[in-house]
Structures are given as structure tokens and as C-alpha cells.
Regions:
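N-terminal membrane-anchoring/stem segments of glycan-assembly enzymes
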Residues: 1-17, 66
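Cell-envelope/extracellular polymer assembly enzymes that use nucleotide-activated donors
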Residues: 19-22, 50, 184, 199
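Active-site beta-to-alpha loop of glycosyltransferases that engages the nucleotide-sugar donor
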Residues: 23-39, 57
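Short, acidic, metal-binding catalytic loop of nucleotide-sugar glycosyltransferases
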Residues: 38-49
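A conserved acidic beta->alpha catalytic loop
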Residues: 55-62, 78-79
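Long helical/loop segments within the catalytic core of UDP-sugar-dependent glycosyltransferases
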Residues: 74-98, 110-194, 199, 203-206, ...
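Active-site donor/metal-binding and catalytic loop motifs
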Residues: 215-223
């Protein structure tokens, strides 16, 4: 109760100019129409960036879609360590100072980067995590609340903002922005656990890095 007494947080300053930003969209077997909406949304974010499709499905049609939309296509010969391994492999092939991570169904708003990169004025900020929200209301996530709420809202709108007050929010993967240097300093995304984002959070905090929570919905996915 004490942790969640005040969930208001100071909004960051506008971001510095000239930051280099990569956008990672890990995918495996998602429908092309879903992936297309995400790529278009990522391309429409206003801060300069490069969008990468990380395709563990190694699909020709995904490569063609990425090429058509002006995105870069990356793949690898195996699927070792699943999503964590996919992101770690992409780290080796890219160079942006900051990385926005979007699930294949997560469509960001145009101001996503403008509202999150400002947190990185603090040199100890490793990750900015945002709430997960969904544009469909017919899923199991909405079984009890219908169109009014889904089962993760307590976590994303009460617990995470409260943990932000004590400098202890979790990285939840998507949607988020990551400082490359911080992630590389702990060996990339953790591969020793199926909850790789949570374990990576612990490693970052243990090494003096901070995670920030931006309590505003700036991306929508499918539940």
C-alpha cells in the first residue's frame, strides 16, 4: 500500500537531438497483416530511427514485406534461446545507441520515441518500460472486465507506477526503450530463464543501472 500511495511520476525533458535509435520487432509466425500494422506504426514514429524485423521464422514473405515498407530484415540460422536469443543476435548486427523493442503485434503511437528518449538524459537509465494495452476486447485478458479492463491493468497501472517510486519497476520486454550500452554490459538479454526480461532487470539493477516506468499508453497490441 505504501509503494502505491503516490503513482505520479515526473515526466522527462524532451530528448536530445541526434541520438541513434534502432527499433527491434522480433517475430516468429505472426500473421503478415498483424506484422504489417506494426511496421507501419514503427515507421511513423517521429524521432529518426531505423526499423528492423528480427524474423526467427525465416520467411521470404516477411523479408519482402520489410523491403516494401523500407525496413531492414534480419534473421539467423537457428532459434536458440527464442526471443532473447533473437534480440541478442540483432545486437551484434546493429549499432544504435538506443533500442525500442516492440512485439510483432504492438503498434506504437507517433510520439512514442519523443516521449521516452528524454529519460536517457540520466546516464544511469538503462530501460524505459511502458504499459501494455490492447485494442481488441474479446480476449481472455478481458474475460472478467469486458471492454472496461483487462487482467494486467492492476500490474501496469498500479504496481509498476508504484515500483517506479522506489526505483524498482520491471522490464517487461515490449513496449520499451533500452540503452544498448547497459544491455551489453550485462551480457545482453538473459537466456538462463524463460522470464528473460525479469532476470535482465535484476542483472541491470545489480550492476547500478536504473529502470524507469513511463505511465502512459503509447502502444497497442492484440491480447
Amino acid at each position: 500500500a505504501f509503494m502505491t500511495w503516490n503513482t505520479d511520476a515526473k515526466k522527462p525533458e524532451p530528448p536530445a537531438e541526434g541520438l541513434t535509435v534502432d527499433v527491434f520487432i522480433p517475430t516468429y509466425n505472426e500473421d503478415l497483416a498483424i506484422l504489417e500494422a506494426t511496421l507501419i506504426g514503427c515507421n511513423n514514429m517521429r524521432y529518426p530511427h531505423v526499423t528492423y524485423v528480427l524474423d526467427d521464422g525465416r520467411r521470404r514473405e516477411v523479408e519482402e514485406l520489410a523491403d516494401m515498407l523500407g525496413c531492414r530484415y534480419l534473421t539467423r540460422p537457428d532459434n536458440v534461446h527464442a526471443k532473447a536469443g533473437n534480440i541478442n543476435e540483432a545486437l551484434k548486427k546493429t549499432s544504435g545507441e538506443f533500442i525500442a523493442v516492440m512485439d510483432a503485434d504492438m503498434v506504437p503511437q507517433p510520439d512514442f520515441l519523443e516521449k521516452t528518449l528524454g529519460y536517457f538524459w540520466d546516464p544511469k537509465t538503462a530501460i524505459v518500460q511502458l504499459p501494455q494495452e490492447f485494442y481488441n476486447t474479446d480476449s481472455m485478458q478481458h474475460a472478467d472486465g469486458g471492454a472496461h479492463w483487462h487482467e494486467q491493468q492492476l500490474f501496469y497501472h498500479v504496481i509498476q507506477p508504484g515500483k517506479n517510486n522506489i526505483n524498482a519497476p520491471f522490464w517487461c520486454g515490449s513496449p520499451s526503450v533500452v540503452r544498448r550500452a547497459a544491455l551489453e554490459s550485462v551480457g545482453g538479454v538473459a537466456t538462463e530463464s524463460i522470464t528473460e526480461d525479469f532476470l535482465t532487470s535484476i542483472k541491470l539493477n545489480s550492476n547500478g543501472w536504473n529502470i524507469k516506468y513511463h505511465h502512459e499508453v503509447l502502444a497497442f497490441g492484440i491480447a
